């Protein structure tokens, strides 16, 4: 085929850089007690700017998740299929300690170093930062129920990413999600109608819906439901201890303008099994501990997006 024109005045692809090559970021980390983690941050930043990771980001964004409500034989499965690049990004984020590892790292500046890593890594691909952030944020809320925290916190903090649908306590590492919003209860979750009925074994049966739940393939979720005492926080696993799927039905995925690599689902619960977290009737106070942490990560993610955009513009 003959050449019709010569490509000129086009910037080469932006790759082979470090998102941690940021004087203000590193100065702040050193100043506030996280200097011991600088080498880890630099290594992660170099990986975030590598051709390999930028290709993962491109593929994850170009191939949005797909919902499979049933398998080929007609069995209900409620699974979301992600591009392999999504799982590669998730594994790298978890292995580098951006999830709940900071809670187990008994060292001054652990949360600062984790925040710097999250900021540097989010410049590669922001969508998968959602479940990473929620896993980090779940820990302080879960600590309102010490027995559950003792069982689940080590797995939330483990540097192992395992996407297989198995009982949470049979896995080596967990991802956590959060479900609050209902059709009539977004900003005001007190209007939520999803009901929680006590069972004889201390668990509760959840019936109702959630209108917007991101990362629906998480292993466990902190949710709000109306118990007899009022709005209460619960821990709801995707897979029950006996290996059966919990009764949470993924109705459809949201068609989103941005954040397309990450799935956000509409969910219905048909007597799904969950365990109470914190004081009954004080669910908002309990789950707000998780909300606050995710909002801090929203700031980090937004700053990362602005930094990535600036870098791209300057390169061009």
Predicted features, each with a name:
Residues 102-103, 116-126, 136-140, 178, ...:
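Glycine- and acidic
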């Amino acid at each position: 085929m003959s050449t019709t024109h010569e490509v000129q005045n086009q910037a080469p692809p932006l790759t082979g850089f470090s998102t941690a090559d940021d004087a203000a970021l590193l100065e702040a980390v050193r100043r506030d007690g996280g200097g011991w983690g600088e080498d880890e941050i630099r290594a992660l930043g170099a990986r975030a700017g590598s051709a390999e990771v930028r290709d993962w980001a491109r593929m994850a964004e170009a191939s949005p998740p797909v919902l499979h409500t049933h398998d080929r034989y007609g069995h209900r499965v409620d699974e979301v299929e992600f591009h392999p690049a999504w799982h590669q990004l998730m594994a790298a984020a978890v292995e580098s300690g951006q999830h709940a590892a900071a809670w187990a790292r008994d060292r001054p500046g652990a949360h600062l170093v984790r925040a710097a890593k999250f900021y540097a890594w989010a410049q590669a691909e922001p969508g998968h930062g959602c479940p990473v952030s929620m896993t980090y944020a779940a820990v302080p809320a879960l600590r309102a129920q010490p027995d559950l925290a003792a069982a689940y916190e080590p797995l939330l903090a483990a540097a192992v990413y395992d996407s297989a649908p198995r009982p949470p306590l049979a896995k080596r590492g967990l991802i956590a999600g959060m479900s609050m919003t209902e059709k009539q209860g977004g900003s005001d979750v007190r209007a939520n109608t999803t009901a929680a009925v006590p069972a004889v074994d201390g668990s509760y049966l959840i019936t109702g819906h959630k209108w917007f739940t991101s990362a629906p393939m998480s292993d466990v979720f902190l949710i709000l439901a109306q118990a007899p005492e009022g709005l209460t926080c619960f821990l709801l696993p995707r897979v029950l201890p006996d290996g059966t799927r919990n009764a949470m039905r993924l109705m459809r995925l949201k068609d989103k303008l941005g954040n397309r690599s990450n799935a956000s689902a509409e969910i219905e619960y048909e007597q799904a099994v969950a365990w109470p977290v914190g004081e009954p009737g004080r669910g908002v106070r309990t789950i707000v501990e998780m909300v606050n942490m995710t909002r801090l990560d929203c700031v980090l993610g937004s700053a990362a997006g602005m930094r990535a955009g600036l870098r791209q513009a300057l390169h061009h």
